[in-house]
């Protein structure tokens, strides 16, 4: 057998040359105590605030309390498999989630892991969940409408792209239904509209029943709206840290569209439950409680989240992220801690009332208490032309209706005002899952403010509206097209619309 020393030595030298000299260094700590989703860890001296750490078995956690002798870690998952003395590793990464168009049509948890059984998500980009909101210079004032398809909102409390509009009300008043209709209303733009106007939707479910989230996803899927939506779900059975993180994760996914010159709409449903889970974490981390036992920084929790919704200027791509946070009140009490906080952070609120809901006024929007601080700059000119008068008339109607309860002998002008107000209130009702295009809303409200409903019985208003819309879609499509393209009611269009209304009103019985 021929042994070649030179060859063997060459192989050995090659092996030695490639031998790794660096030992793998990872900073580790030990679990001192664990319980209620919180672990106290000794060691990890150089850990960053908000850094992801790893427990045995691949369970992740986030370092929130950095104290002199230990680190308070919240656990993203079950703490049953973690025990005292376990080794905890630093990952060196701040909590981040996958972002990008690959997530559209998917249901994910607060860490961006798919939970819909449709296989892995092949997203190439990741983004930190908690980033700084854009400053003042990169922003632009809100000036484009974000149409929800609901007459009561688009006419009276308009929402613009880049705005934060709070949806607030007691349980079972239709808060989620408003978000759902706003999502469904984007379908027409996605199917035929220009690329620059498409609005991608993100729905964050915090602390909801799984059946409720499944129902929401089912409706989106059945109506063809899931393909441009992302669902982030941290349900009631998920640990508090996941419920706390979900809105930030959803926001990071929405920011991808905002920062790439596209438009996104995000609904947080709801931030009351996020505040409750944050309170739970803070108390277990032994942070001092404040009002209603919430920690002192619960205002900052919501403000840093909602400030990330913005309209960017043209240099930054002119994208936008619109936020519709939801807050659940107890017994219509908007003066509680969390409702007042979020009202002061947002650019207006849509106030829903149980009484209106049970009277059959749905969406149950209290027009008197609801405001949009962006106002008519988020409306097209055509909507401003018809909505200006409806606001005034409804305000007068509410005032008069209060007095009319006491006196029976009313003069003709007051009676006329009450009649008109009752019909306009009826006109603003809208069944669920039937959002209207802006030009259709304009035509319907035009009929209302120009007296076409005054002679009808209140019960026939809905029937009149349905008939009018069918008539305009078939006979008067040119009028609707003109309103859509001109974005205003010109004198010519006004004449045609009046003629169409006259001919329809004659035939309507």
From Swiss-Prot:
SUPFAM superfamilies: C-terminal domain of alpha and beta subunits of F1 ATP synthase (SSF47917), N-terminal domain of alpha and beta subunits of F1 ATP synthase (SSF50615), P-loop containing nucleoside triphosphate hydrolases (SSF52540)
Enzyme class: translocase
GO cellular component: plasma membrane; proton-transporting ATP synthase complex
Catalyzed chemical reaction(s): ATP + H2O + 4 H(+)(in) = ADP + phosphate + 5 H(+)(out)
Main location group: membrane
Keyword Hydrolase on entry: no
Subcellular location: Cell inner membrane
EC number: 7.1.2.2
Gene Ontology molecular function: ADP binding; ATP binding; proton-transporting ATP synthase activity, rotational mechanism
Recorded topology in the membrane: Peripheral membrane protein
Site feature location: Required for activity: 370
Keywords (A to Z) from UniProt: ATP synthesis, ATP-binding, Cell inner membrane, Cell membrane, CF(1), Hydrogen ion transport, Ion transport, Membrane, Nucleotide-binding, Translocase, Transport
Binding sites annotated in the UniProt record for ATP: 169-176
Record has Cell cycle as a keyword: no
PROSITE patterns in alphabetical order: ATPASE_ALPHA_BETA (PS00152)
HAMAP family for this protein: ATP_synth_alpha_bact
Subunit structure: F-type ATPases have 2 components, CF(1) - the catalytic core - and CF(0) - the membrane proton channel. CF(1) has five subunits: alpha(3), beta(3), gamma(1), delta(1), epsilon(1). CF(0) has three main subunits: a(1), b(2) and c(9-12). The alpha and beta chains form an alternating ring which encloses part of the gamma chain. CF(1) is attached to CF(0) by a central stalk formed by the gamma and epsilon chains, while a peripheral stalk is formed by the delta and b chains.
Role summary: Produces ATP from ADP in the presence of a proton gradient across the membrane. The alpha chain is a regulatory subunit.
Family per record: Belongs to the ATPase alpha/beta chains family.
Name the UniProt record assigns to this protein: ATP synthase subunit alpha
């Amino acid at each position: 057998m021929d042994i070649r020393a030179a060859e063997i030595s060459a192989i050995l030298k090659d092996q030695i040359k490639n031998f790794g000299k660096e030992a793998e260094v990872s900073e580790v700590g030990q679990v001192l105590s664990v319980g209620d989703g919180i672990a106290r860890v000794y060691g990890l001296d150089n850990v960053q605030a908000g850094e992801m750490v790893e427990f045995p078995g691949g369970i992740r956690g986030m370092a929130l309390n950095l104290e002199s002798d230990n680190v308070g870690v919240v656990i993203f998952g079950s703490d049953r498999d973690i025990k005292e003395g376990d080794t905890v590793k630093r990952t060196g990464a701040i909590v981040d989630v996958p972002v990008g168009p690959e997530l559209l049509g998917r249901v994910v948890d607060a860490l961006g892991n798919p939970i819909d059984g449709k296989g892995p998500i092949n997203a190439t980009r990741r983004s930190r969940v908690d980033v700084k909101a854009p400053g003042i210079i990169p922003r632009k004032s809100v000036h484009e409408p974000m149409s929800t398809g609901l007459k009561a909102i688009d006419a009276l409390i308009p929402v613009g792209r880049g705005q934060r509009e709070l949806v607030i009300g007691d349980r079972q008043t239709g808060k989620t239904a408003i978000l759902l209709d706003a999502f469904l209303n984007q379908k027409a733009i996605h199917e035929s509209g220009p690329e620059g106007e498409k609005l991608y939707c993100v729905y964050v479910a915090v602390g909801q029943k799984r059946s409720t989230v499944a129902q929401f996803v089912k409706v989106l899927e059945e109506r063809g709206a899931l393909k441009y939506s992302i669902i982030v779900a941290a349900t009631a059975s998920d640990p508090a840290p996941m419920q706390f993180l979900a809105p930030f994760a959803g926001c990071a996914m929405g920011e991808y569209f905002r920062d790439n010159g596209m438009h996104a709409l995000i609904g947080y449903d709801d931030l009351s439950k996020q505040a409750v889970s944050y309170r739970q974490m803070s108390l277990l981390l032994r942070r001092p409680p404040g009002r209603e036992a919430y920690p002192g920084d619960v205002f900052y929790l919501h403000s840093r989240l909602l400030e990330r919704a913005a309209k960017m200027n043209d240099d930054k791509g002119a994208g936008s992220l619109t936020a519709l946070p939801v807050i659940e009140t107890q017994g219509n009490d908007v003066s509680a801690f969390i409702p007042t906080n979020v009202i002061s952070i947002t650019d207006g609120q849509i106030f829903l009332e149980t009484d209106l809901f049970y009277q059959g006024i749905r969406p149950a929007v209290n027009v008197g208490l609801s405001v949009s601080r962006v106002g008519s700059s988020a409306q097209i000119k055509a909507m401003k032309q018809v909505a200006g008068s409806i606001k005034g008339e409804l305000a007068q109607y509410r005032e008069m209706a209060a007095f009319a309860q006491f006196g029976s002998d009313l003069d003709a002008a007051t009676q006329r005002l009450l009649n008109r107000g009752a019909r306009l209130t009826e006109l603003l009702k809208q069944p669920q899952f039937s959002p209207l295009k802006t030009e259709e809303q304009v035509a319907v409200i035009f009929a209302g403010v120009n007296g076409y409903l005054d002679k009808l019985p209140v019960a026939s208003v809905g029937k009149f509206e349905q008939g009018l819309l069918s008539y305009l879609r078939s006979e008067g499509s040119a009028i609707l097209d003109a309103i859509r393209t001109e974005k205003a009611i010109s004198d010519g269009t006004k004449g045609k619309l009046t003629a169409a209304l006259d001919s329809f009103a004659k035939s309507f019985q």
